[in-house]
């Protein structure tokens, strides 16, 4: 995915100015940045097109998974899986559920009573079943326990290996993502998206901002 000279303004504030967006398929494209720089606005723009630069071919082919993405919370995991089985291919459900290790989640407990990590796994399943080619992850490991973060890292590594046609954009401020998941590395900095080929160099720049 390539968008040249991309500018994003929200409520009169310029977040990105004449920067080039280039995200590759078959790998995780990490975009890191400090709180408040506009990372979530960038994530939303792939769907909402506030910039007027996101083409219909992109907007119609994006799944955005963020803290504001919701699944029903007054049903159980078993009910959710049954509901999803009416809309999506059973083999795909089983495959993603296996990669997410969903068997460890009690199928009878209401989703609202599950841990944040368990809810996030069910959210990943629900949205990835849409099978869109562009997947935007907005702070999906934020506030999760370390064990769940490690499991999600492992899941993303396996998922992209098995789905090399996908473009996954991981918007985060969790630097552990960069070490745990190999990919391309970008920083949201000074109204630009800048690529770094060295994880250590990017982390150094990020810390010293």
UniProtKB/Swiss-Prot annotation:
- Keywords in alphabetical order: ATP-binding, Nucleotide-binding, Transport
Q: Which residues form the ABC transporter domain?
A: 1-207
Can you tell which superkingdom this protein's organism belongs to? Answer: Bacteria
What Pfam families does its record include? ABC_tran (PF00005)
Gene Ontology molecular-function annotations: ATP binding; ATP hydrolysis activity; ATPase-coupled transmembrane transporter activity
Q: What happens when the gene is disrupted?
A: Up-regulates expression of the LiaRS two-component regulatory system; this effect is more pronounced on modified competence medium than on rich or sporulation medium.
* The family this protein is said to belong to: Belongs to the ABC transporter superfamily.
Protein name per UniProt: Probable peptide export ATP-binding protein YydI
Q: Name the species this protein comes from.
A: Bacillus subtilis (strain 168)
Which gene name belongs to this protein? yydI
